[in-house]
Amino acid sequence: MPSQLDHLKTLEQRLLWLSAWTVHNANHLRDKRDDDVKVGGHQASCASMVSIMTALYFHTLRPEDRVAVKPHAAPVYHAMHYLMGNQTLEKLQNFRGYGGAQSYPSRTKDIDDVDFSTGSVGLGVAETAFASIVQDYLEAKPWAADRPLGRMVALVGDAELDEGNVYECLQEGWKHDLRNTWWIIDYNRQSLDGVVHEGLWEKVEDIFKAFGWRTVVLRHGALQREAFAEPGGETLKSWIQSCPNADYSALTYKGGAAWRARLMNDIGDQGDITALLDRRSDDELAALMNNLGGQCLQSLCDAFD
């Protein structure tokens, strides 16, 4: 019998396909005039959020919780609600068109159950913190004291952390003993406006800790952690953590044979690490190297629990 994790993986793949198709259809399949401009839609930003949103929505959330979905993950959000019967095929087909599903989740223009309107980029992040503060105010009132406290969750693109209002909000949260607030940062190191510099996550973590947040970093998935426990695993872990993002992305695209060649070239034949690699086919090696924390449903579910 399939496990809950198996069902989550099925949902993950369907969300990945449908969100990618929604953007592809808007740009390449539906009728357009010769002078129409490109529609856009951020397929990569969607792909990096699929596992996170699958674990969050289908494993973790309670009815009283509220979520601000990062703007560029709107196609994933619309795809998810389509699977649940809350969105129509016609609106997906007209994504980013007049009357279609919106570019960014919108409480006033979308028909799926949007908790927070999250355009412009960066605003949805701060909304969750102030919503939590308002929730604390209401809890102090006798007419709202029995309401269950919800978690205010922001799904944050790493490039959204360029927005100054995020840091103003962190300070306000510290002043008012912010609680029941999750900010889940999609650290995909991709930005249309610039480069997300290597090592930025450490600076971000320091800032959150300075304002009293409990930080959890999901760097490696379950497959990688299991491999690290094998002889030669620490060598592999060290290589992964020092590999530049540009190289890692290129190797992910090329696949298992490229991973094997690069690892052997960089590390050399060292017995244990060579045996670790030899125990895995090219496909298995690719799955291992792609099993980072943000793409591992098991790791995400465990962290959210």
Task: Name each model feature, range by range.
Residues 1-3, 105-114, 148-152, 183-190, ...:
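Gly-rich Lys/Arg/Thr-decorated short loops/hinges at beta-loop-alpha junctions or inter-strand turns
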Residues 3, 7-15, 19, 23-31, ...:
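Cofactor-binding active-site loop characterized by glycine-rich and histidine/acidic residues
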Residues 66-70, 180-188:
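Short internal beta-strands
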Residues 150, 177-181, 212:
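Short glycine-/polar-rich loops that comprise or flank the Walker A/P-loop
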Residues 187-305:
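Long, well-ordered, tryptophan-enriched scaffold segments
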